[in-house]
A protein has these predicted regions:
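An amphipathic, basic-hydrophobic helix/alpha-beta surface used to engage anionic
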Residues: 1-85, 92, 277-278
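C-terminal signal-anchor/stop-transfer transmembrane helix together with its immediate cytosolic
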Residues: 1-44, 331, 335-338, 346, ...
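DG-centered beta-turn motif at the end of beta-strands
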Residues: 27, 53-56, 94-96, 132-139, ...
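Short, charged loop segments at secondary-structure junctions
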Residues: 59-62, 99-130, 180-185, 287-288, ...
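VWA/integrin I-like adhesion module and closely mimicked acidic/polar interface patches used
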Residues: 157-198, 220
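Acidic, S/T/G-rich, low-cysteine, solvent-exposed domains in lumenal/extracellular/periplasmic regions
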Residues: 159-173, 177, 296-487, 546, ...
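Intrinsically disordered, low-complexity Pro/Gly/Ser/Thr-rich segments with frequent PxxP/GP/PP motifs
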Residues: 230-255
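Membrane-embedded catalytic interface detector for glycan/lipid assembly enzymes
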Residues: 448-451, 457-464, 469-617
Length: 617
């Protein structure tokens, strides 16, 4: 009996132990998510190799065996030599265009790798993975089933690429990351340029600012910076601490006229795509002003513009406005109108959308239902009933670019009586308009919306005060006209800006082209009267256009356009192995092999074996 009881207890203990082992095994399997080669996870079909070769500008950094891009190209070729002839190959770069959507033979893939050059657009990991998944799905739906799928990513893996949404790879997909590292993680580059004054006129003083960044751990003791502004050339040498920036200033007197082609250039040894910043501007011969006023409007507006010959003023009544004249003008001024006819209001909105600047000076008894719809469209504050309390000028927003170069020193608080009455501002807190003259009550007496629309909140008639007798009044009117003379931006950025707005007329008789010494490109555009929206965000533009200065030409030259590369990869901040693996695993990619290449790709063994995921403790 005792032996039977011992046997029973022993069997009971064994059963308990077995059940615990089975439970533990189940837990391990649940967390590990194992992949079976003989079950549902294994598919029959042709093997596939997908290679992403990062060709963004950071890959132009110098590695042990040339640029990182050339090393990556050779690494991809070596991978292709290891696969069987039956393997379906898909090569993609940052272009992700229609050419790269097709699976190729090994021979075709090798030829295509030689065609991949630097590209102005960067891609995130999510961009590439999602695009590859779509191509895999489409190929299997339209062509054939795929067996084992290996996806290879060759890149320096910038932190700017570190965006990834949740992925759901199939069991037959495995992933391989090859990180190429430059010899030096150093880069000096031109970050941006700007002018002390936002407008340009012949024989006036101007100052160019150039900001240079020094990324890395080594100081720059004698970095050469060369400046060319039309006929003006300057050189200086900069000292920049490691990880610091410096702003160089170049004062000059404007001796150029018409279109002015410019560039700033540094001599850096590591990466070169960001060593030059191109820009352009116009010194106009004439600015056209269209003055819409009533018979009783203040004559002081026209007198203010008459002090300089370059301002050509055309006057008209509200009922006689020409749409053609509106389209051809630089600055439209509404002077003292009480009513704005609906047709004129629509023409003004269209003109503003086409790039014309608008200055509004209200009449002394305005119809708010005429004014406020227009003000809303121009992103200006709406006006309410006149008020007369605390309207002494207290502050000038002299830090705003509108007043750049106007005052020699910072303006202190004022308490100057300028007007007796002003229209109240109804929606100041919800408006994006910028107040430039502020009364003691906090109300804006003058404001702007960007640099395209300007509004006085007081009328010029004597019942509202003596604004026309203040020295600020003609100064502000002339500054509005100066802003109106700019027809196109100083520069645009490839890979960031989708379009460039140019105020110019173009006939469809000839194609619209970007022309430089190296290339000629027919540009896509959307045209309205005296306004062109040039499309530079498409695949064709990004593949053909390089950073530089371009003549915009139809039948005749319309503008000089400066294009620059995006500086998003100028700071060489790389993902570490743990950061990359954690990013992938947290978003569903749990079987990625990581390889880092520091001493040249030719010394790196190519091992594209399946990798299984394990439960990470």
């Amino acid at each position: 009996l005792e032996k039977e009881q011992q046997s029973t207890r022993k069997l009971k203990h064994l059963l308990i132990l077995l059940s615990r082992l089975l439970a533990l095994t189940a837990l391990i399997f649940a967390f590990a998510q194992p992949q079976s080669k003989n079950g549902e996870g294994q598919r029959s079909g042709k093997p596939a190799l997908l290679i992403y070769l990062d060709n963004s500008f950071s890959m132009t950094a110098i590695g042990t065996e040339g640029t990182l891009l050339s090393e990556g190209r050779e690494l991809a070729k070596r991978m292709l030599q290891t696969v069987s002839p039956a393997t379906r190959v898909l090569i993609c770069s940052n272009a992700l265009n229609h050419v790269e959507q097709r699976f190729q033979t090994k021979a075709e893939a090798l030829r295509y790798l030689d065609q991949i050059e630097s590209y102005a657009l960067t891609r995130t990991l999510d961009d590439v993975l999602s695009w590859q998944q779509r191509q895999i799905k489409k190929h299997q739906e339209l062509k054939e089933k795929l067996g084992q799928i290996k996806q290879v990513f060759i890149s320096d893996f910038q932190q700017s690429q570190a965006r990834l949404e949740q992925q759901k790879p199939e069991a037959n997909q495995s992933f391989f990351a090859y990180q190429l590292k430059a010899q030096q993680n150093q880069n000096a580059y031109i970050d941006s340029i700007w002018f002390a004054k936002p407008t340009h006129h012949i024989n006036t003083d101007q100052m160019l600012m150039v900001r240079v960044q020094n990324f890395g751990t080594q100081a720059k003791k004698r970095l050469e910076l060369n400046i060319k502004i039309g006929q003006i050339k300057r050189t200086m040498f900069m000292q920049i601490d490691a990880g610091a920036e410096q702003i160089a200033s170049f004062p000059y007197k404007e001796i150029n006229n018409g279109s002015v082609l410019c560039q700033a250039h540094i001599n850096d040894q590591q990466i070169h795509f960001d060593d030059t910043w191109y820009f352009s501007y116009e010194v106009p011969d004439q600015t056209n002003i269209y003055l819409i006023e009533e018979a009783n409007s203040s004559p002081n507006v026209a007198k203010a513009f008459a002090v300089e010959e370059r301002y050509k003023v055309w006057k008209t009544l509200p009922g006689q406005v020409s749409s053609t004249a509106l389209a051809e003008t630089d600055l439209i001024v509404l002077n003292g109108l009480d009513e704005i006819p609906s047709g004129l209001r629509e023409d003004l909105i269209t003109a503003h959308q086409n790039g014309q600047r608008i200055l509004i000076i209200p009449g002394e008894d305005i119809t708010f239902n005429d004014y406020n719809p227009l003000l809303r469209e121009l992103s200006l504050c709406e006006l309410g009933a006149p008020q007369a309390n605390a309207l002494n000028l207290q502050r000038i927003n002299d830090a705003d670019p509108f007043f750049s170069g106007v005052f020699e020193k910072k303006q202190q608080k004022w308490n100057v009586p300028m007007v007796k009455k002003a229209y109240s501002v109804l929606n100041a807190t919800n408006s994006s308009a910028t107040p430039l003259l502020i009364a003691r009550s906090g109300q804006a007496l003058f404001m702007r919306s960007n640099t395209t629309a300007f509004l006085w909140t007081t009328a010029l008639q004597p019942s509202f005060g003596s604004m026309v007798n203040q020295s600020l009044f003609p100064t502000i009117l002339l500054r509005c006209a100066e802003f109106a003379s700019q027809r196109y931006p100083n520069y645009a950025i490839l890979g960031k800006d989708a379009q460039i707005k140019v105020r110019a007329s173009h006939s469809n008789e000839a194609p619209l082209r970007f022309i430089s010494a190296e290339t000629e490109f027919i540009v896509q555009y959307v045209g309205t009267p005296n306004n062109l929206r040039l499309q530079i965000g498409g695949t064709a533009a990004l593949e053909r256009l390089k950073a530089g200065l371009y003549e915009l030409k139809g039948i005749e030259t319309l503008a000089q356009i400066a294009l620059n590369y995006n500086r998003i990869e100028s700071q060489l901040k790389l993902l570490s192995k743990s950061e990359l693996i954690d990013l992938l695993e947290s978003n569903g990619i749990k079987n990625c092999n990581f390889n880092q290449i520091k001493e040249g790709q030719s010394l790196t063994a190519i091992v594209l074996k399946e990798s299984n995921s394990y439960w990470r403790l």
